[in-house]
Amino acid sequence: MAHRTVGAGISIALTGTATTSAAFKVQSNVLRIVATGGNAYVAIGTDPVATTSDYIVTTQGSESLAMLKMSQRVVGITKGTTTVLAAPEGTTMPFNIGDRVTLDYEGNTKNDSNYTTLINDTKVVGKSRSAGVGGDFEEKVTVEANTAGVSTAFTPAGNATLFMSNKVSVISPNPTAAAVVYIQQVQTTGSA
């Protein structure tokens, strides 16, 4: 099977206690994992803590684990102590309450970078749609980010996208001193 890398890879030192990566934007539905210097038990999610009951990746080869990939373009942001992000009319926000999300401008420099700094691995706490008379047909999510202090208005002209955020947690019951887990989002294609 052929692989194409997506985004930057992550390496985590394996120890006898659970170690969790920084959050990353989910840009692919496959996560390739290689363990060196000791078998690794792996947990993936919004706030994972690996245990020896989780999925095992041995030093004998790599494993490809599935993730849920979700994203949506953002056309509006309502600032406040919590922040409301709107999808284009006629579309939905695929995120659920409890998910974690990250805003990315994907090269767009029209918006204040404070939005991406504050809306980074932030928990979704609400979801709404106000369709109907007096409504706007935009589905919205509310996140825990406090953007009340951002002085610049959000500009929808550009590629502002909200991505699902995940973390990876690993643990090894008997790692060597140089034990490391390498993690990379990949796209897979047919047979190699």
Feature-to-residue mapping (PLM):
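Beta-sandwich interaction modules
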Residues: 22-23, 60-70, 165
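Short, surface-exposed beta-edge/turn micro-motifs
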Residues: 27-30, 39, 122, 166-167
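Short proline/glycine-enriched turn/loop motifs at strand-loop junctions of beta-rich domains
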Residues: 28, 34-41, 90-96, 176
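Short, surface-exposed beta-strand/strand-loop-strand elements in extracellular ectodomains
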Residues: 37-53
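Terminal beta-strand-rich extracellular "head" domains
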Residues: 48-64
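Small/polar beta-strand repeat architecture
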Residues: 71-181, 190-192
